[in-house]
């Protein structure tokens, strides 16, 4: 597995934060690093496999990667990222208690992926721009200024995450997409889902298409197929059982959609034939 080292990314041996834009981010094999990372998805779509679990990501997704996590990107479509790298909680001179603003693992579950709305994403861009142009002076005021900007970024993300319960349409769509991640295998009635999240059906269709480039049903199918591919690689369940577990009522239809999406059959994935080009 590829290991990325801080010496190759941080501007100096003492700098606690670095900015790495990926415009766009191509598919990238599994890796980990000796630093922490906040991944901010500007726009586009892709699959982020995080510690073996696949997540669909799009504009407004924010992922918090720790120094012991492993991840990769695949199936990317104009995926543009800004990576905010930071060494460790004890690398800062003026900041303490950062863990209170970051996602925390509880009972083995780490809420690594958050979502923010487009207006917040614009504020994030402005803050990151200030961080990029803050200079590399090592006198106390310069260092403090850079650390303050990083703290402002964490506060903005924390306040704007799903946990803060914003009520505009962007936030409602983010909540809906998070709900689909957990309920993808269920039968989904879009009218009922729209009502559940206080969106009109028309707004749901329009906003999901703007965020992901996909219609709601196409987005749900892709989500199901991504989860199915993960099970094909990492479980002993039969293809038919996996199809049903992932919300498909007919295994033949599942196989047709799977091949159309990934250019491999479920059996090919089960046998590892795609690994040659990973």
Curated annotation (Swiss-Prot):
Molecular function in Gene Ontology: DNA-binding transcription factor activity; sequence-specific DNA binding
Pfam families this protein is in? AraC_binding, HTH_18
Site positions for Interaction with sigma-70, renumbered to this chain? 241, 250
Provide the GO biological process annotations: positive regulation of DNA-templated transcription; rhamnose metabolic process
Q: Which GO terms describe its cellular component?
A: cytoplasm
- Main location per UniProt? cytoplasm
- Name all HTH araC/xylS-type domain ranges: 174-272
* Keyword Membrane attached: no
Which residues carry the record's DNA-binding region feature?
A: 191-212, 239-262
Judging by the UniProt lineage, the source's domain of life is: Bacteria
Protein keywords: Activator, Cytoplasm, DNA-binding, Repeat, Rhamnose metabolism, Transcription, Transcription regulation
Q: Where does the protein end up?
A: Cytoplasm
Role noted for this protein: Activates expression of the rhaBAD and rhaT operons.
Q: How does it assemble?
A: Binds DNA as a dimer.
Q: What is this protein called?
A: HTH-type transcriptional activator RhaS
Q: Which organism is it from?
A: Salmonella paratyphi A (strain AKU_12601)
């Amino acid at each position: 597995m590829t290991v990325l080292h801080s010496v190759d990314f941080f501007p100096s041996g003492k700098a606690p934060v670095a900015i790495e834009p990926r415009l766009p981010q191509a598919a990238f094999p599994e890796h980990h690093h000796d630093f922490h990372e906040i991944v901010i998805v500007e726009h586009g779509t892709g699959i982020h496999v995080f510690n073996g679990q696949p997540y669909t990501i799009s504009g407004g997704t924010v992922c918090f990667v720790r120094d012991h996590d492993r991840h990769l990107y695949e199936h990317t479509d104009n995926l543009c990222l800004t990576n905010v790298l930071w060494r460790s909680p004890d690398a800062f001179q003026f900041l303490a208690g950062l863990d209170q603003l970051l996602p925390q693992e509880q009972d083995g579950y780490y809420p690594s992926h958050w979502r923010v709305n487009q207006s917040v994403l614009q504020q994030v861009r402005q803050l990151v721009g200030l961080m990029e142009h803050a200079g590399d002076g090592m006198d106390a005021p310069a260092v403090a200024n850079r650390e303050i900007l990083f703290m402002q970024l964490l506060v903005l993300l924390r306040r704007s995450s799903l946990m803060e319960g914003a009520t505009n349409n962007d936030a409602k769509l983010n909540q809906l997409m998070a709900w689909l991640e957990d309920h993808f295998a269920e039968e989904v009635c879009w009218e009922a889902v729209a009502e559940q999240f206080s969106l009109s059906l028309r707004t749901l269709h329009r906003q999901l298409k703007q965020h992901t480039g996909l219609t709601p049903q196409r987005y749900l199918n892709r989500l199901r197929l991504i989860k199915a591919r993960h099970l094909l690689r990492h479980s002993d369940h039969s293809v038919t059982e996996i199809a049903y577990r992932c919300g498909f009522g007919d295994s033949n239809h599942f196989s047709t959609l799977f091949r159309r999406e990934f250019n491999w059959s479920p059996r090919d994935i089960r046998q590892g034939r795609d690994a040659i080009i990973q």
